[in-house]
Design a protein with these regions (language model features):
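Class I SAM-dependent methyltransferase Rossmann-like catalytic core
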Residues: 46, 50-83, 100
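Conserved class I S-adenosyl-L-methionine
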Residues: 82-93
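Short glycine-dipeptide loop
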Residues: 84, 107-109, 194-200
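A short glycine-rich, Lys/Arg-flanked "PGG" loop and its adjoining helix->strand segment in the class I
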Residues: 102-106, 177-196
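S-adenosyl-L-methionine
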Residues: 124-152
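A short acidic, Gly/Pro-enriched loop at the edge of an enzyme's catalytic core
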Residues: 150-161, 165
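Conserved Class I S-adenosyl-L-methionine
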Residues: 212-241
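Core SAM-dependent methyltransferase catalytic element
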Residues: 251-297
Length: 297
């Protein structure tokens, strides 16, 4: 009896102690980690447009101020210039159109040639030096070439050749002593540059058809019929005209020719407000096509 009591005394505390132990918690189901969404694909670069090229902050403010006269976006649209084109700009001068064309073509994978004699390259040279990233890809070549020199734009490679306010210079024999009119040779060389189906775009100061043709040699104006004859004699087909650069206020009859009007204002302060009110010249905008080669039988 005493042994039983002693055994009970030992067992009861152990039982009580065991009763206070907490049963091990049942394992909880693990929550799967949320799947990470794939990173969005980078946005494709915006397709270059003429509108964005014209609106670019890299353009010279003085050039932008002349947009109301020169109308770059509708002019280039009329010529059908695409950002993937190979374009030759003939005699770019101070680079007014170069500031629009170079970024547009660079962004689209196109190519720009600036074609001018040594004395006509300073504007493009300044652009290239000031902003190599934007203008460094411009290929500067000679034009027109004389004395049997080889053309520097490979034949049949250009999608478009553009020249702004220059045909009258060739007709006048500008800076070409002893060769008063080299326009025929200039058009022949342009024709050779273009691919079959390529575009020649011309903008120039328009002389009325009723005016004396001799004024083409002194006034800076030239007749549409003269330009068409030069182009068509070189083999081009006339593809249309636009009045986007027309100015009915310009009579083309001024004391110092077209240079009487802005931006030249050759008379300085004499009648300055009168000529500013007229604005820049009345200009033709003509498009020509180099015909596609006829398939041989």
């Amino acid at each position: 009896m005493r042994r039983f009591a002693l055994l009970a005394a030992l067992v009861l505390p152990l039982t009580a102690a065991g009763a206070t132990q907490t049963a091990p918690a049942a394992p909880q189901a693990s929550t799967p980690a949320p799947e990470t969404a794939p990173a969005p694909a980078p946005a494709a670069p915006a397709k270059p447009t003429l509108a964005t090229a014209v609106a670019a902050s890299t353009r010279t403010p003085a050039n932008v101020a002349r947009d109301k006269y020169r109308n770059p976006e509708p002019t280039l649209a009329f010529f059908g210039i695409k950002p993937t084109d190979t374009v030759v700009e003939i005699w770019p001068g101070g680079g007014w159109y170069t500031e629009v064309l170079a970024p547009y073509l660079t962004a689209g994978g196109g190519k720009l040639y600036a074609a001018a004699p040594d004395w006509g390259r300073s504007g493009v040279d300044k652009l290239k030096a000031a902003n190599p990233a934007l203008y460094g890809g411009i290929q500067v070549v000679d034009f027109p070439v004389f004395d049997g020199k080889a053309a520097e734009v490979p034949a049949g490679t250009a999608d478009a050749v553009l020249t702004f306010r220059n045909v009258h210079n060739w007709r006048m024999g500008y800076r070409r002593d002893g060769e008063p009119d080299y326009s025929v040779d200039a058009f022949r060389q342009i024709y050779a540059m273009l691919k079959p189906g390529g575009v020649l775009g011309i903008e120039d100061h328009r002389l009325p058809e009723t005016a004396d043709a001799e004024r083409e040699r002194t006034s800076g104006y030239i007749k549409v019929s003269t330009v068409r004859r030069l182009a068509e004699d070189a083999g081009f087909r006339f593809a249309g005209s636009s009045e986007v650069n027309a100015n009915p206020k310009d009579t083309a009859d001024w004391p110092n020719g077209v240079w009487t009007l802005p931006p030249s204002l050759a008379l300085k302060d004499q009648d300055r407000e009168k000529y500013l009110a007229i604005g820049e010249s009345d200009r033709m905008t003509l498009k020509f096509i180099k015909p596609a080669e006829t398939a041989k039988p």
